[in-house]
Amino acid sequence: LDGVELFFVLSGFLIGGILLREINSTDDFKITQLFHFWKRRWFRTLPTYYLILLANYFFVKYEIVNENINEFNYSFLIFTHNFFTPFYGFFWESWSLSIEEWFYIITPIFLFLFLKVFPPKLTFFITALIMILLPCVYRFYNYDDSIDFFWWDVAFRKTVVCRLDSIGYGLFASWVFYYYRNLWSKNWAPSFILGSILMIFVINLEIDPDTIYKQVVYFSLVSFSIM
């Protein structure tokens, strides 16, 4: 377990809280509010990302960093370099931010659309459920019984569509916290203990990467235990 897994769930929880307050503060969630949300998020993340991307390009080009300059292309500019397909050889660290950026894009769009039909409480629940279930289905559909650890890492652990559920668990936690605050307050201690036990068990269970457990179930259990 590394800090990225914690970051995904925590990010979903914090951003989920912001979005919940946003959709409950008005009877009509307008498209201008979508752009306002994106503008705030992108002003916080994109300038630094592009600066580091540029620095990486020159470091690799002039062989200060030992990576492959031929792996660089426009997809790094729009965060599609690891959307469906694995990437490696250039700017390895960018995988997690790409997942985060797509979460910023997709979640508010779901909320905007579902609010046309459902009340805020049900809208947010459905959105969180979609974010949790779709990546699991995708991972199951793409199960590979001949994969090694390297390809498990780049093809499952570090692609956007495989990992959005980690943030989805954070969204679900923010929904429970917002609408069922008393339940949360009464049960946080036993939940923390049980979650910690589950996490310790999951991360210490040595299972080969070519199994359904490692490719499909593992990520869900880790995120659920953090939630």
Where are the language model's segments positioned?
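Small-polar-interrupted transmembrane alpha-helices in polytopic inner-membrane proteins
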Residues: L10-S11, I52, K121-Y141, F192-I203
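Juxtamembrane transmembrane-helix termini
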Residues: L6-F43, T48-I64, T107-K116, L171-Y178
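Alpha-helical transmembrane segments of multi-pass integral membrane proteins
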Residues: F58, I167, L171-F172, A189-M227
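Specific transmembrane alpha-helix
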Residues: G3-R21, L97-L113, T127-L183, V216-M227
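Membrane-helix interface segments
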Residues: F29-I31, I69-N70, V117-F124, L183-A189
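Short, amphipathic, aromatic/basic-enriched membrane-interface segments that mark the entry/exit
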Residues: E93-S98, W184-P190
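Membrane-interface helix-loop-helix regions
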Residues: I31-R41, L46-I99, M131-K158, S225
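Membrane-interfacial loop-to-transmembrane-helix junctions in polytopic alpha-helical membrane proteins
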Residues: E67, F84-Y88, P120, F150-V160, ...
